[in-house]
A protein has these predicted regions:
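Core dinuclear metal-dependent hydrolase active-site scaffold
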Residues: 2-8, 42-47, 53, 168-196
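Metallo-beta-lactamase
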Residues: 67, 74, 83-94, 108-180, 186-259
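Active-site metal-binding loops of divalent metal-dependent hydrolases
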Residues: 8-10, 57-60, 91, 136-137, ...
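Zn-dependent metallo-beta-lactamase
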Residues: 1-50, 234
Length: 261
């Protein structure tokens, strides 16, 4: 399988839950608010024998009318229209921002479009992909609302024929396993992709950074920090025994471990 990290840059985040861009060459973490965390925001593209997958969708930033996630894919030689599956660990704003985009003025509103016509309408950002979302995670997003979720970016998911709502654990097309973990948020899920003798693991925000896998770290920002820590330890041990390839969404230095791709 081919793994392509789609980095959107490094950021600091504090109790305000605002993502502030951070230049690792110039900026000083000590100059940021007390308690600020340094994180990467890094969706992934995985090319398998069956699919072109996108795992989580970043912050949804645009430059010159082009979604950053789309530009990163284009830079890697992949057309956004070629993506066949979008796997969502959860719907927090730093993971789900690129699910949809503002529809260009004057365009035709398709089945995945919400909000009428014109510049205010939104459409799913991958027109030919199936989106895989835990049903209860979407419901929870609307219950919880800001500041962790931006529900207007999620409205497209509600009635689109492109969306497959998942209820609990299961397997997609015989080779993508998914499991609800909770821990970071109540309906967070993780994925194992098994193809061609390889096993890739994407742990979303329960397993966001390499260093957290190696320590008994309990995060205050997690819904159940103790469970998250225990899951990381379990996955780290099993992953080494079974030669998993780990994808780390928030790791500034090590997006893929081991880095053999």
């Amino acid at each position: 399988m081919k793994i392509i990290p789609l980095s959107e840059g490094a950021f600091t985040i504090d109790k305000t839950k605002l993502f502030v861009p951070f230049d690792t060459e110039k900026d000083d973490l000590q100059q940021r608010a007390v308690g600020s965390l340094l994180v990467e925001v890094q969706p992934f593209c995985v090319v398998t024998s069956e699919d072109i997958l996108v795992l989580d969708t970043g912050l949804g930033f645009e430059k010159d009318g082009v979604l950053q996630l789309h530009q990163n894919l284009l830079d890697a030689g992949i057309e956004p229209a070629a993506v066949t599956k979008v796997l969502m660990s959860h719907l927090h704003k730093d993971h789900a921002g690129g699910i949809s985009r503002v529809k260009a003025a004057g365009g035709d509103a398709g089945a995945g479009t919400i909000g009428g016509t014109g510049a205010s309408a939104r459409e799913l950002s991958f027109p030919n992909a199936r989106y895989y979302v835990q049903r209860k995670e979407l419901e929870y997003a609307y219950e919880k609302g800001p500041s962790s979720y931006i529900t207007e970016e999620l409205d497209c998911l509600k009635d689109s024929p492109q969306v497959v709502f998942l209820d609990g654990d299961g397997v997609l097309d015989g080779y993508i396993k998914y499991a609800v973990t909770g821990a970071h948020c109540p309906y967070h899920q993780v994925f194992w992709i098994v193809d061609g003798g390889e096993k890739i693991f994407f742990g979303g925000d329960v397993a966001p950074q390499l260093q957290q896998m190696k320590s008994r770290f309990v995060a205050k920002y997690d819904y159940d920090g103790k469970k998250a820590m225990e899951l990381r330890q379990e996955w780290w041990q099993k992953g080494q025994e079974e030669a998993w390839t780990f994808l780390f969404y928030h790791d500034v230095k090590t997006p893929v471990w081991p880095d053999s791709h």
